[in-house]
């Protein structure tokens, strides 16, 4: 068993790990870093409000309420504009810059962003180099990649390009774009080969769901850093589970998190935001908590915020009553 404690980073999951979820999960965990949802860059220097909307932590020194640093992730294909927006993100307080070369979304790939860049290692090199040159050397530049578009044959060329461009570290999701998130397609061995090849830190990502899978991933890859996304939603205290081999959070504690989440003020919410996000989160939670299946069945047909909130409060009350008895 590997006894050293790994760096644990909270992944950038678009439309899932939003500022509210980051605030909640970093309060109950021990993350070393969290990465924002991507900021889409096209052909302009974006207004500050775009960065503040996606990463409001920038308004408080680049930290979550619990003190976890936030790194802004940029998505795009034009080196000049990626560089200009990277510079702005640093000025606003981002702890370094992350460049997205792994998002498998059809919409994103259709506009030549995210994983679509894996087809063009030279463009990845140019974009990463432009970002690195625009950002002060004291600020880290990282790149998140997959093993390739439809096969892993170019993974070394891509990783080499990222290192040669001056990136400080690289996060490798152990599947190709076409693999999607199929568990049986995870390839930690390829991450390990990249780690052996490079001189910069390599962070492993993909199918890290509990203490045992984290241990196995580290044994195979020899990576000292891990990035977790879906697993962090399945098991809300996963970083502590991985770092300290503690038990997963009890369902009663998960209910309290759901209660906190549904009560978080959101001035942009028209009444549907928390409704959709609670249902979405329950779908992740049911991978680790059978009780989440029952709660989802209760709320799935509820379309009002007040209705969902009432169901969550009732579930908390029932649980407290059961525990008291």
UniProtKB/Swiss-Prot annotation:
Name the catalysed reactions: 5,6-dihydrouridine(16) in tRNA + NADP(+) = uridine(16) in tRNA + NADPH + H(+); 5,6-dihydrouridine(16) in tRNA + NAD(+) = uridine(16) in tRNA + NADH + H(+)
In alphabetical order, the GO MF annotations are: flavin adenine dinucleotide binding; FMN binding; tRNA binding; tRNA-dihydrouridine16 synthase activity
Which cofactor does this sequence's record say it needs? Answer: FMN
Annotated Pfam families: Dus
Which residues carry the site feature described as Interacts with tRNA?
40, 100, 181, 277, 279, 284, 300
Q: Which SUPFAM superfamilies match?
A: FMN-linked oxidoreductases
Q: Which HAMAP family match?
A: DusC_subfam (MF_02043)
Report the family membership: Belongs to the Dus family. DusC subfamily.
Q: What does this protein do?
A: Catalyzes the synthesis of 5,6-dihydrouridine (D), a modified base found in the D-loop of most tRNAs, via the reduction of the C5-C6 double bond in target uridines. Specifically modifies U16 in tRNAs.
Task: Report the protein name in the record.
Answer: tRNA-dihydrouridine(16) synthase
Q: Which gene encodes it?
A: dusC
